[in-house]
């Protein structure tokens, strides 16, 4: 078994309220990405990846278009990135990435989630040193040597390549995301990526069970219910 990167479909939105919240989070992230990196997905690979991911998660086209149009206008809110770290139920390590127009409010909201499960938010760097900030690509394939050669020819600092069940998984530093994706598409054409994003990948996992699992799931629900929270990374295994 390979590295345990997060599957962002762990908690699928089942109700209309949950779906609306997912759409809102994607809309905000697409807006920020387009505003900072350009509205053309062909020139902004991060935006292209984000749009593809939104479509896979069944985000309506009008939500995506509205966010890009908003970025095109140059107006709208200013969102800042905010990252919080700490220890969750069962001494698990957690990183919470946010986009916020009011960092003080966001910090208070995230801290309340920790407090509700009798855990404490930590200082910056308290757990992130136990995660690798990685670009991750997963796609169908059988020849990891050819993949490695293509990436090395493009001077990508490959962290790891795994081959399992007819799928190739590539790990590279997050700073090499664009370079790695360009190298893969140049070498192998229009790849249909199962995973194509930047994540924090835990170096080690913490196994939880029983009541700890219930508390941890509640903790994730509390965090994901916050409008400002975009992604939650953790090292829990259960």
UniProtKB/Swiss-Prot annotation:
Signal sequence annotation: none
GO BP of this protein: regulation of DNA-templated transcription
InterPro entries (UniProt xref): Integrase-like_N, TACO1_YebC-like_2nd/3rd_dom, TACO1_YebC_N, Transcrip_reg_TACO1-like, Transcrip_reg_TACO1-like_dom3, YebC-like
One Pfam short name: Transcrip_reg
The entry's keywords: Cytoplasm, DNA-binding, Transcription, Transcription regulation
Record localization: Cytoplasm
Cited Gene3D superfamilies: 1.10.10.200, 3.30.70.980
GO cellular component, one term: cytosol
GO molecular function: DNA binding
Stated family: Belongs to the TACO1 family.
Protein name as catalogued: Probable transcriptional regulatory protein Mmwyl1_2868
Species assigned in the record: Marinomonas sp. (strain MWYL1)
Taxonomic lineage from the root: Bacteria, Pseudomonadati, Pseudomonadota, Gammaproteobacteria, Oceanospirillales
């Amino acid at each position: 078994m390979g590295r345990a990167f997060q599957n962002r479909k762990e908690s699928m939105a089942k109700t209309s309220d949950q779906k609306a919240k997912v759409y809102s989070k994607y809309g905000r992230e697409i807006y920020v990405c387009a505003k900072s990196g350009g509205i053309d997905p062909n020139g902004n690979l991060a935006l292209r990846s984000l749009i593809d991911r939104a479509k896979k998660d069944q985000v309506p086209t009008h939500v995506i278009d509205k966010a890009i149009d908003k970025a095109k206008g140059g107006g709208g809110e200013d969102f800042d990135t905010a990252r919080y770290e700490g220890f969750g139920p069962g001494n698990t390590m957690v990183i919470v990435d946010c986009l916020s127009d009011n960092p003080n409010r966001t910090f208070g909201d995230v801290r309340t989630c920790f407090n509700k499960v009798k855990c404490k938010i930590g200082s910056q760097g308290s757990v992130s040193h136990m995660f690798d900030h990685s670009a991750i690509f997963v796609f169908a394939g059988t020849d990891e040597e050819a993949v490695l050669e293509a990436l090395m020819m493009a001077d990508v600092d490959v962290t790891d390549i795994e081959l399992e069940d007819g799928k190739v998984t590539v790990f590279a530093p997050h700073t090499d995301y664009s370079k790695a994706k360009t190298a893969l598409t140049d070498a192998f054409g229009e790849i249909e990526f199962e995973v194509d994003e930047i994540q924090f990948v835990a170096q080690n996992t913490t196994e939880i069970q029983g009541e700890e699992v219930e508390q941890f799931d509640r903790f994730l629900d509390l965090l994901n219910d916050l409008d400002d929270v975009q992604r939650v990374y953790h090292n829990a295994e259960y």
